[in-house]
Amino acid sequence: MEAILRAILDDDRPKVRKLLGADPRLATSLIETARLYQSKICHWIYVGDTALHLAAAGHRVELVQLLLTAGADPNATTNHRRSGPLHYAADGYITGPVWDPRRQVATIRCLLRAGAEINAQDKNGAAPLHRATRTRCAAAVKCLLAAGSDARLRNKSGSTPFHLAVQDTGRGGSGADVARAAQRQIIRQFLSFGLTPALKDGKGKTVLDSARSSWIRNMLSENPADPG
């Protein structure tokens, strides 16, 4: 298992292909020791993740396809967070050194074609759309909405993805110019999708109520408040 994990982190496709050819079980084996943060892919890896989780987190789309062809489960939720590979693919670190939104979208589409459940919720009730919104991955949000994500789905805190779009996520780099620009794009995407600032969370709080920044409130106030 160690060899294929190293090969995935190094994006060594010939090595991954060779290892899978020698032992196809590697496509479904579970990581048994904590890996924690992996700087090469800017993502956390946990016990119970699979090689597909690792490849999806790194948006290594060619490796994702190799693993799927070898029998990897696109809906594996064997880690403690009950997150699938699509959750990891929806995550991104847009201020990171290896950020590539096109590869992220390609990875998401690859997993969806393989049967990944687009509205699967992890143990906190977060679906891939929640994750993409929280990490300010505008291209991923657009891709997931177009593919049929439920934009009104609530996590265990009661928040819809639109509510997360107008809030400070607390994520590192969220105040950077690139993150603010992505946040603006995401808000526009939800509005264009037909959601309104009057959409309520599980506690009855609207999206407009959740917005604290004046520029966000101004964006929302320019749109109809019919909850639909």
Task: Give the positions of each predicted feature.
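Conserved ankyrin/ankyrin-like repeat signature
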Residues: K15, E62-L63, R103-T107, A139-A140, ...
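Ankyrin-repeat-protein effector appendages
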Residues: M1-R6, A114, A147, Q167-G228
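Ankyrin-repeat boundary/"N-cap" motif
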Residues: M1-I4, L30-A51, T77-T95, Q121-A127, ...
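Amphipathic alpha-helical repeat scaffolds
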Residues: M1-L9, R17, H53
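Ankyrin repeat domain, specifically the short helix-to-loop turn at the C-terminus of the second helix
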Residues: L20-L26, T33-A34, Q65-D73, R109-E117, ...
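Eukaryotic tandem repeat interaction scaffolds
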Residues: Q104, I118-S157
